[in-house]
């Protein structure tokens, strides 16, 4: 019986979190559009996780030998720069679009 209560409690907690995420990321979209609050929250969590990873864990994806050009040069710097730039751009756009308790995509 305790397991059933725990499962219901966990389900309620997940439902509450999803509703809260949708409230925090209230976005003006056409009625047929899908809610993107969970997607934004996932992106925010992923960005935060990447910042907290140690350098070698995050960098291994770009520093591996599989990311070389035809002359054998490692392309990690270019890939790393692109990742940082796109993250900064996304964060900047997110801050610029926030207003009136939500985000307005125009």
Swiss-Prot record:
Signal peptide: none annotated. Heart. Residues 58-80 have a biased composition (Basic and acidic residues). Residues 81-92 have a biased composition (Low complexity). Residues 48-106 are annotated as: Disordered. May be involved with the regulation of GNRH gene expression. It is not known if this protein is transcribed. This is Putative protein SH. It comes from Rattus norvegicus (Rat).
